[in-house]
A protein has these predicted regions:
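Short acidic/histidine-rich active-site segments
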Residues: 64-69, 133-155
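Aromatic-lined glycan-binding groove of carbohydrate-active enzymes
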Residues: 48-104
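C-terminal helical cap
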Residues: 101-127, 176-190
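Active-site environment of divalent metal-dependent phosphoester hydrolases
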Residues: 13-19, 36-39, 69-72, 146-148
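Conserved, mostly hydrophobic/aromatic
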Residues: 8, 31-33, 62, 143, ...
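Mid-to-C-terminal alpha-helical segments outside catalytic/metal-binding sites
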Residues: 156-199
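Histidine/acidic residue-rich metal-binding segments in metalloenzymes
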Residues: 1-30, 44-60, 121-136
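Acidic, His- and aromatic-enriched active-site or binding-groove loops in soluble protein domains
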Residues: 28-38
Length: 199
């Protein structure tokens, strides 16, 4: 992948695969939609502090996932319970996973339990990476196209990005840091992967 200018994304890979990639790659790697594991203990889809530090050492970027289950341990537990309940109900009703009734039942449980994280949890995720490795290795991964009805309050779609920027300003992030987080860090990693390659 390095040899053809293809960026390597470690979101969704196992820990073993992650460490293999870090050993082999000679270009910046990214986690396109992951958050710090320390915020959601036991949720291995997120990144350990060691992984975050190793991505930074490649000059890569950790693009923060906004999903409630990715940034808040209580939300993670509730959504796990909801998914388990929905699957049990689906089997009992002999329905397919993509049947409309299944989604309606899931929405009923979500509306009842209100398991959503808050935008502050996303800002905490950004703070954690910042405190660990600095502002050169953070970006927004959102995962708007993959999360469905699990996004935090005040961060439901791209029109609410301004809330995130305002949150960063309130937490005393500089204009330069915010620009890095919004786009400059990702562009740097992208361009480093494309260096010496024609597209």
């Amino acid at each position: 992948m390095n040899s053809i200018g293809m960026m390597i994304d470690v979101s969704h890979v196992s820990d073993d695969t992650f460490f293999d990639i870090v050993k082999i790659s000679n270009k910046p790697i990214i986690a396109s939609h992951s958050s710090p594991r320390v915020l959601t203990p036991g949720f291995e889809r997120n990144l350990s502090d060691e992984m975050i530090e190793l991505i930074a050492k490649t000059n890569g970027v950790i693009l923060i996932n906004f999903g409630s289950s990715f940034v808040n341990s209580k939300s993670n537990k509730i959504f796990t319970d909801i998914n388990d309940d929905v699957e049990k109900w689906r089997v009992e009703k002999k329905l397919k996973s993509d049947d409309k009734e299944v989604e309606e039942y899931r929405d009923q449980l979500i509306n009842k339990l209100n398991p959503f994280a808050d935008i502050e949890d996303v800002l905490d995720a950004i703070d954690h990476v910042y405190n660990l490795v600095g502002d050169d290795y953070i970006g927004f991964g959102s995962d708007y196209d993959g999360l469905g009805n699990t996004l935090p309050k005040n961060l439901k779609d791209v029109s609410t990005y301004i809330n995130l920027i305002e949150g960063l300003i309130k937490r005393a992030y500089s204009k330069e840091s915010i620009e890095k987080i919004c786009y400059k860090n990702f562009f740097r990693a992208w361009n480093a992967n494309l260096q010496n390659h024609q597209i």
